[in-house]
Regions:
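Active-site proximal loops enriched in glycine and acidic residues that flank catalytic Cys/His/Asp
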Residues: 8, 36, 231-233, 258-262, ...
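Nucleotide-activated donor-dependent transferases that construct or modify glycoconjugates
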Residues: 1-12, 21
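Nucleotide-sugar-dependent glycosyltransferase catalytic domains
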Residues: 2-3, 27-226, 231-254, 268
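Motif I (Walker A/P-loop) of helicase-class P-loop NTPases
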Residues: 18
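A donor-sugar binding/catalytic signature common to diverse glycosyltransferases
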Residues: 22, 103-105, 275-283
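Histidine-centered catalytic micro-motifs
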Residues: 15
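Conserved sugar-transfer catalytic core signal across GT-A, GT-B, and GT-C glycosyltransferases
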Residues: 21, 112, 245, 282-283
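Nucleotide-activated donor-binding/catalytic signature segment of Leloir-type glycosyltransferases, i.e.
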Residues: 224, 258-260, 264-281
Length: 283
């Protein structure tokens, strides 16, 4: 029997792929402690794992977070450092006392990775979409304004990295926080055939495909096609997009399930066509 710790960010798209993995680990007799958030506690506890909420340590999300996600690197580093240091005393104390055999942390939940390295605990990276390394980074084209924003933020980023080093976290460059290296055991919840530049990743990367439970029958009549529309769990406040989808498909012979996220005001989307089911999320 092993003791395994999971860390994840407060996002369904990052938590959901781990649920059945955790359930299977518990079923096999392992003990699992999962550092997550109140919103996900019931789902995690249903697996038999212990959920440890971290809500009180998260800084308030900026109002313009939708514009910053994936674009403002210095803000991401700020949040990472703030959360890592805010939870440090609590989490490191608990980890030292419990003595886990392994730490599994989401690729965006960087504090889990930092704690594992600081305590010299074997680390596994959980990657919910595509793995990211220096080679795949070249595929991401940046505009001049994005490059200038990144360059202007480098002094701030380097200052925060120095702060981490003063607390015992051996981080030399900021990209070490974000990318997957070929020496780290990594689970990727997509097929290798879908991974860009898959040949650049070592055999430490296990491409499992989706990790989901067998779905219950939905009751949908299969006489017409069923269309599912979703923008994920982070950048989903896109009212114009949802309205365009309804206009495009309202007269088509299809049924549509459109997941718009918990922060989208469904009443603000106007009249919902009869062939549409608009909901915050799909279980």
């Amino acid at each position: 029997m092993s003791k395994i710790v999971f860390f994840c960010i407060p996002a369904y798209g990052h938590t959901n792929p781990t649920i059945e993995v955790v359930r299977e680990l518990v079923k096999r007799g392992n003990q699992v402690h999962y550092y997550s958030f109140y919103e996900f506690r019931s789902r995690i506890q249903e697996t038999g794992a212990v959920c440890i909420p971290c809500d009180d340590f998260m800084p308030p999300a900026p109002k313009d977070i939708d514009k910053k996600v994936g674009k403002d690197l210095s803000s991401l580093v700020d949040m990472t450092v703030d959360v890592t240091l805010a939870m440090e005393d609590k989490v490191l104390g608990e980890l030292r006392a419990w003595k886990p055999d392994c730490i599994v942390s989401d690729s965006i939940c960087i504090w889990g990775k930092l704690y594992a390295k600081k305590l010299n605990v074997p680390f596994v990276c959980s990657t919910t979409t595509f793995a990211f390394n220096q080679q795949t980074a070249r595929l991401m084209k940046q505009s001049l304004s994005e490059l200038l924003r990144m360059l202007s933020g480098m002094p701030r980023i380097n200052a925060r990295l120095r702060q981490l080093r003063r607390h015992g976290y051996e981080i030399r460059q900021f990209y070490e926080l974000l990318q997957n290296d070929n020496d780290t055991e990594t689970i990727v919840y997509t097929s290798k055939e879908f991974q860009p530049m898959s040949e650049t990743f070592s055999d430490k990367f296990t491409f499992t495909g989706p990790s989901i439970a067998v779905p219950k029958p939905s009751g949908h009549k299969k006489s017409r096609p069923l269309v599912y529309i979703s923008l994920g769990t982070v950048l989903n406040r896109q009212e114009d997009f949802y309205i365009s989808c309804m206009k495009a498909l309202k007269t088509e012979a299809v049924d549509v399930i459109m997941s718009v996220g918990g922060r989208t005001d469904i009443s603000g989307l106007g009249v919902i066509p009869d062939n549409f089911q608009v909901i915050p999320r799909v279980n």
